[in-house]
Amino acid sequence: MIHFFPTFSKGAKNSPFAKELAALGVPHRLFPGEVILRYHARIWLLLLGWPKVTKFAISSAIRSLILSKPYPDTVVVGSHIEVIIFGIFRALLFRKRPNIVLLGFIFTHRPQPLANWLRGLYFRFVFSIADQAICHSSLEVERYKEIFKSSRTRFEYIPYGLHISVDADPSEEQRTLEKKNFPDAGDYILSAGRSGRDYATLFKAVAPLPIALHVVCDSEFALSGLEVPANVLLLRNCYDKAYVQELKNALFVVIPLQVNDISAGQMVLIQAMAFSKPAIITRTPTVEEYVTEGVDSILVKRGDVVELREAIQRLLSDQGFKEKLGAHANATYKSKFCMKAYVTNLIGALQKP
């Protein structure tokens, strides 16, 4: 019996994730909740977000490990806080099971040596509890095996995957900003995301081009100190259906990455593929596990303004190539990164001896 604790919606029992689990016939239960962690600054995540996660984790552990029957063999959680809470309950109940699995682990370095050391110490403690951690690149698996070599945790790689709804309406903020900044709004390209982004390079690349760029990013840090060109529209509160609308109507997607040693950009990349949108993305070892240059995407050198600008110009001028990339991207999504593929890969990793 596997217990899952999705935090994206209280109605997760009827989600595509739940339906694919049911289709596989794997004994499982879902204990859903809605824990929204959308904050412009990291301090609010620490002060407001993590207490929400802690409350959800305690409630989930009680429902899963005490109130439910039969008890689970495995629990799959989405945060380090949940690992600790479930580990405490497992110890207090004098049980060897369930196995505790951390899904979607990413370990980012901090520029301050002390902060880096403290985070390393903290996660060594987390991995003295967790039995398994799922990562979304093989590079990270090898890296974490080395960093946390004395831990009890088994690190596994599975590709990221998702389902995205095609039903979407623009937000009021989106309508107002577009009307104010682009009264004759027409074609635009889209960039989105906050983690590991290199918007400085992207802004320099698009500044002289005759095309609008919409950037969906709610992080103050990711955009701090940047000069925003006149043809760039920032959407800081664009989520859910409004974000999908932005994606659906874009000519194509550009994902500039600053990091090359962790998973970054895959979510937006796969969302673009689901809508048959070609993507220009920074070439990194993790990205190259998901797409192929010239087949379903264009890969560019990190920090190279000229190469990025030329890639954008190519997709703007070559309609046939753009359509071919989009079609191949959608085929790749359906075969490798849709919800069915993701759930199949996840269950396969959980069931490994």
Language model segments and positions:
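Donor nucleotide-sugar binding/catalytic pocket of nucleotide-sugar-dependent glycosyltransferases
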Residues: D131-K145, S150-E172, A185
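Short acidic/histidine- and often glycine-rich active-site loop of Leloir-type glycosyltransferases
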Residues: S224-G225, T284-G294, I298-L299
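Conserved donor-binding/catalytic core segment of Leloir-type glycosyltransferases
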Residues: N181-R197, F203-H214
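Conserved acidic donor-binding segment of nucleotide-sugar-dependent glycosyltransferases
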Residues: E293-G294, I298-V305, R314-G320
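Membrane-proximal helix-turn-helix segments that form the acceptor-binding/catalytic region
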Residues: I62-P70, R95, L114-A133
